[in-house]
Amino acid sequence: MPTLRSATASASTAGTASPTAIATPRSAKRRLTSPRRAAGSPDASQFTSPHKSPNVGIVGTPKLLSASPRSSRKRLYGDFVAAEKPKWNPRGKSPESHFSRAQSSDWDLTKEFICSADPAQMQVVKEALHVATVPSCGLVCRDDEQSRVLEFCKGCVEQERSGSLYVCGCPGTGKTLSINKVKESVARWADETGMETPDALSINCTSLAKTHEIFSKILAKFQTRKKATCKLSPLQQLQTMFSHKESAPRRMLLVVVDEMDYLITRDRAVLHDLFMLTTYQFSRCILIGIANAIDLADRFLPKLESLNCKPLVVTFRAYSKDQISDIIKHRLKVLEYDVFEPLALEFCARKVAAASGDMRKALGVCRSAVEVFEARLQESSDQEFGLVTFDHMDIALSKAFKSPVVDSILCLPQHQQMVLCALANTFHHCKKKATTLGELNKSYIEICRSTQVPAVGMLEFSNMCMVLSDQGFMKLGQSKEDKLRRVMLQIDSSDITFAFKGNRFFQKCLEQQKF
């Protein structure tokens, strides 16, 4: 085999020097290892199979690209695919990787890999639905309430006057989050207009060891320098400060008192004195109280109304189903992929809106539905990447709105549960409000016969009914004979039906006709 040197010498003797012949060893090696790059060169025949014609045409390399179906698809549809919203992949891997792993001999390892959910993606979804997570898009569905509070604060700052406002509403209606947003808006507005930015103080009354400590926190924010008044209580120091122009602070103070219900004492003195701080002539306090009680200002502050200083009341109404759905969708926008089926979200919104309108409850239900979906994903080997469905949401809602009575029923022994089933059947079929212990025993025996469970004797049956009566499930009357004692159901029969939902054994007991 001739060497490169001899090949070069012979080529120069012949007088026909080709580009390949005069190439250096390094360039020749690069061309040999990159036949795709060399396909467009004049000597492409040296790098192609002798049985196939080289892909050389008028346009050279672009023709080689057009011969690849994959490249053609990427050119034609690449822009369209990129514009689509990416799918949620809860397993963290693509279906192709699952398929390739499934072809391996280690099937146990592959099955464990396929059945495991991606904890990183699950955690991102749960954090987006967490109550403590402040949505980047801002608070939606509370524009009117925020506008009223903001205008109130602006008026106080512009006129350098004190004022009080009371924010009320059911739990989970966005009160605290809205007021925090207003605080930021007030500071931003003051900077833009050249006004002096007011100081801000947020107090959660649940953190106070004693109710009167709230005055110490307010006094510390003003940073008074007078030492002669140290013998006075913090409330007295504030009252003295706001009564004289010389001692009054120059800067306004925005005080936000959350969970104001905890300040309600027997004499209501703390709550009354707190609102009265805004009535002094040289007061610089803008007080905003937040509580769940809608009529707190009417019930606990009658003196304020007589002094013509009743606070402005802003009520946050419970969220509607459309508002709950919109808020959840806004939180999920940061994920850039769909997690819930639309029907599942609508079901959650309708259920929570009908019950309480509590947004925190709705977010908790959605997180629970994701956990149910995650548990199902661990158990299933299906390679399809589904969404959180209506069934997952139904399970989560059942857990969230389950009555404490249901938990008590599920903790009872089997025969006592069967007695409750017999009692529910008796009242359901006969439409009665009461029966006798003897009739209830017949229904119980019929259930035992149909389920092939040995029934207990009459004495033990009577003792079981007495235990159920002591626990509040039923009420037993008095009689000389046990069989004639009146029995009344003390709980809702729907709780019994709901407790045994999905249990085949007790479903059969509840379907039993009256004996």
Curated annotation (Swiss-Prot):
Keywords: Cell cycle, Cell division, DNA replication, Nucleus. One of its GO terms (molecular function) is DNA replication origin binding. InterPro entries: AAA_22 (IPR049945), Cdc6/18 (IPR016314), Cdc6_C (IPR015163), Cdc6_ORC1-like_ATPase_lid (IPR054425), ORC1/CDC6 (IPR050311), P-loop_NTPase (IPR027417), WH-like_DNA-bd_sf (IPR036388), WH_DNA-bd_sf (IPR036390). Residues 43-52 have a biased composition (Polar residues). Its main location: nucleus. GO terms for cellular component: nucleus. Residues 1-24 have a biased composition (Low complexity). It is found in: Nucleus. Residues 1-70 are annotated as: Disordered. One of its GO terms (biological process) is DNA replication initiation. Coiled coil: none annotated. Pfam families: AAA_22 (PF13401), Cdc6-ORC-like_ATPase_lid (PF22606), Cdc6_C (PF09079). May be involved in the initiation of DNA replication. Belongs to the CDC6/cdc18 family. PANTHER family: CELL DIVISION CONTROL PROTEIN 6 HOMOLOG, CELL DIVISION CONTROL PROTEIN 6-RELATED. This is Cell division control protein 6 homolog.
